């Protein structure tokens, strides 16, 4: 009986010891794990979806960067029509896209004919709370106690994903992008014809800074995008996309401290650009142009594209 209990104890301790060794490695090797070369291994396959960008031969390309608010908020077809072919607008935004993924996509594209980049800023994208929408490699950035909470709140598979990422196993939830060489009808923009189902909560609940905090990595890679533009002689402008009035009221009432903290994080990372406000958000009676508090509908996309083109001309 004693031998059985002894063997059982040894057998039980083996997974626990393995768990402890892996977590100690993640904690002590954090800096090495998040070197640019390491992150590039996780995100290098994302640019395949944008190989069509290199086939556009135009001396003045303008890249639109950001998440879903930019993907659905601006029509490149309308912008190119307004520009009368003097500029070629191209939308590289995607649902929940962050600065890290954006940076590695940009690094793999031909930037020689890009004259300007405009990046929409959604502050909640810069939180660790949003890691649930990211490649599993970013789960290595969560301290152990936050990883435990995340596992309970969002994904019981967290630690399995975390250890797979540690050894660079593929992320089945974020497979390599399919090579795309055909130019999309709206140059990467998409019109939103139905109401999104995952944006019903107030904006003040999207951050969860007390539980997970900001992602310093996102701020670092935002600044890397700025530096890349400076290196290539490309003008860079950051701006806030338009919001519905209920969003604006909620943000002003409940997110003052969050916004102040966000701006402090930007400054800490070396980001000194002024983020331009959205002109459309200031116009009265425009709630009908939104599919929800964050995203413009098709009519809103066309309207905002005209405002945005005027903004580009003035800046």
Map each language-model feature to its residues.
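Hydrophobic membrane-insertion alpha-helices, especially the h-region
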Residues: 6-27
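Alpha-helical transmembrane signal-anchor/signal-peptide segments
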Residues: 26-47
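Membrane-embedded segments
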Residues: 58, 63-150
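Secreted/periplasmic serine-hydrolase-like ester/acetyl group-modifying domain
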Residues: 121, 130-232
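Active-site segments of SGNH/GDSL-like serine hydrolases
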Residues: 191, 226-251
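Substrate-gating cap/lid alpha-helix
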Residues: 244-278
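Histidine-centered active-site loop/cap adjacent to the catalytic His
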Residues: 290-315
């Amino acid at each position: 009986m004693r031998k059985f209990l002894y063997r059982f104890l040894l057998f039980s301790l083996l997974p626990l010891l393995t768990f402890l060794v892996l977590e100690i490695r993640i904690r002590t090797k954090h800096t090495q794990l998040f070197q640019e070369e390491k992150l590039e291994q996780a995100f290098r396959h994302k640019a395949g979806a944008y190989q069509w960008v290199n086939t556009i031969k135009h001396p003045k390309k303008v890249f639109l960067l950001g998440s879903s608010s930019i993907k659905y908020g601006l029509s490149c077809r309308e912008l190119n029509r307004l520009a009368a072919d003097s500029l070629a607008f191209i939308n590289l935004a995607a649902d929940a896209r962050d600065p890290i993924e954006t940076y590695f996509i940009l690094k793999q594209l031909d930037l020689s004919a890009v004259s300007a980049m405009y990046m929409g800023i959604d502050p909640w994208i810069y939180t660790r709370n949003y890691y649930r929408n990211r490649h599993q490699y970013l789960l290595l950035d969560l301290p152990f106690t936050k990883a435990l909470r995340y596992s309970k709140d969002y994904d019981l598979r967290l630690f399995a994903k975390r250890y797979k990422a540690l050894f660079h196993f593929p992320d089945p939830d974020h497979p390599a992008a399919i090579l795309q060489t055909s130019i999309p009808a709206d140059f990467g923009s998409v019109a939103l014809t139905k109401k999104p189902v995952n944006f019903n909560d107030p904006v003040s609940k999207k951050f969860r800074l007390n539980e997970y905090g900001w992602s310093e990595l996102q701020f670092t890679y935002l600044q890397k995008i700025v530096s890349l533009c400076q290196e290539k002689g490309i003008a860079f402008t950051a701006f806030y996309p338009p919001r519905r009035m209920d969003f604006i009221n909620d943000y002003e009432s409940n997110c003052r401290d969050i916004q102040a903290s966000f701006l402090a994080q930007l400054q800490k990372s070396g980001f000194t650009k002024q983020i331009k406000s959205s002109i459309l958000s200031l116009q009265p009676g425009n709630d009908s142009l939104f599919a929800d508090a964050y995203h413009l509908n098709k009519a809103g996309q066309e309207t905002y594209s005209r405002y945005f083109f005027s903004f580009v001309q003035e800046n």
